[in-house]
Amino acid sequence: MTQNENPSAQSGAKPEDKARPAKALQGVKGMNDMLPADAPLWEHFENAARAMLRAYGYQQIRTPIVEHTQLFVRGIGEVTDIVEKEMYSFTDALNGEQLTLRPEGTAAAVRATIEHNLLYDGPKRLWYTGPMFRHERPQRGRYRQFHQLGAEALGFAGPDVDAEIILMCQRLWDDLGLTGVRLEINSLGQAHERAAHREELIKYLEGFKDILDEDGKRRLYTNPLRVLDTKNPALQEMAANAPKLIDFLGEESLAHFEGVQRLLKANNIPYKINPRLVRGLDYYNLTVFEWITDKLGAQGTIAGGGRYDPLIAQMGGKAAPACGWAMGIERIIELIREEGVVPDAVGCDVYLVHQGEAAQQQATVAAERLRDAGLDVVLHATPDGKSGSFKSQMKRADASGAAYAVIIGEDEVAAGVVQVKELRQGAQAEGGGQQAQVPAENLVDYLIDAMVGASE
């Protein structure tokens, strides 16, 4: 190529193409980022949830995001909406296995319990949290990736534990300051009772074939209970007059349900019996429940659960009773916002302001010593690597939410001192909010004493 030849001209590329910035990539629709501004609300929820779970003696379990597809087909039910049309499934290119991004947490928790023989020494109370995935149209309160908190009480058969898992939710609502969340409960009885009801229900629904929507027709013979869970306004009267499962329950199932209600009443938990409440998963029996709010529109269910005694044996484990709940964290975060609950602002303890190379070095050492003492410290830094003026740095310090600013310049380095300035109301540095000069070697003790004074 000669010196005058233009390689871009030979390739057909236009010179201006090289200067065109790359198109910014976007996240997947329905899979949302949690940004720093959202973090205080999430931390507020997570801290309250962990404290509540600890109060009831639940231990955390963590399972993989990806499981074998068959786990959910067998665990959730082959004719459920989740398995039929909402799962993110794929074939593993390495070995041809059918795998799925988990759409819910109970099946995986039960799988882990069986695989690791967790019930060998008695019942267990477990909890989990993490992202779940469902392939559906994103809308308010319903996302393709969402976060779930769940609790599972494994190996307990009595209505006392059914009541306990409901009380856990109520305690969390109280701790979060949520109001207007109502409880609906029902009993699905046992398999033979549901079979007798199913026979009568199918006969009843066959008389309405002409008005059933597509979902109703599809479920009529595979999962008729779910037909009653319709949101179609045109089918509400039909659903309301359908044979009620509770009328088919035997003495044992009724006694269990009455036991749950008795304990809820004893704890002053108001509830409504909803005979059409069936939940969307096939593994439930006996008690089912939902916590509902009117403040989130159509997606008003913020938590739900119940008893699933057959599931452990159904998934290959030794038969054991079980019950639990799950709640959608994004919906609860939105409800916290609707309620106007404002968590305490989270700021650092100290913001370190510095100017000059020697001051930067001393500030770095001071920051590490303060962190060694357990303080949260932000060391000033800028995109261009220059420290900036003291005035601009102090603006950053104010905005950080720090209780104190520690200021180090060339004069301070030469004198072996630092300046400590109170930034936030309630900080108790000597001088009552004024700026104090402190020997550099005494900085840690000075700030710890000041912060102890602020907390008294």
UniProtKB/Swiss-Prot annotation:
Cellular component GO terms, alphabetical: cytoplasm
Biased composition (Polar residues): 1-11
UniProt cross-references to InterPro entries, sorted A to Z: aa-tRNA-synth_II (IPR006195), aa-tRNA-synth_II/BPL/LPL (IPR045864), Anticodon-bd (IPR004154), Anticodon-bd_dom_sf (IPR036621), His-tRNA-ligase (IPR015807), HisRS-like_core (IPR041715), HisRS/HisZ (IPR004516), HisRS_anticodon (IPR033656)
Database matches in CDD domains: HisRS-like_core, HisRS_anticodon
Pfam families, A to Z: HGTP_anticodon (PF03129), tRNA-synt_His (PF13393)
Annotated region (Disordered), positions in chain: 1-22
Domain of life (superkingdom): Bacteria
Keyword line: Aminoacyl-tRNA synthetase, ATP-binding, Cytoplasm, Ligase, Nucleotide-binding, Protein biosynthesis
Gene3D superfamilies named in the record: Anticodon-binding domain, Bira Bifunctional Protein, Domain 2
GO MF: ATP binding; histidine-tRNA ligase activity
Biological process, per Gene Ontology: histidyl-tRNA aminoacylation
Localization per Swiss-Prot or TrEMBL: Cytoplasm
Main location: cytoplasm
Complexes and interactors: Homodimer.
Similarity comment text for this entry: Belongs to the class-II aminoacyl-tRNA synthetase family.
Name of protein: Histidine--tRNA ligase
Organism: Cupriavidus pinatubonensis (strain JMP 134 / LMG 1197) (Cupriavidus necator (strain JMP 134))
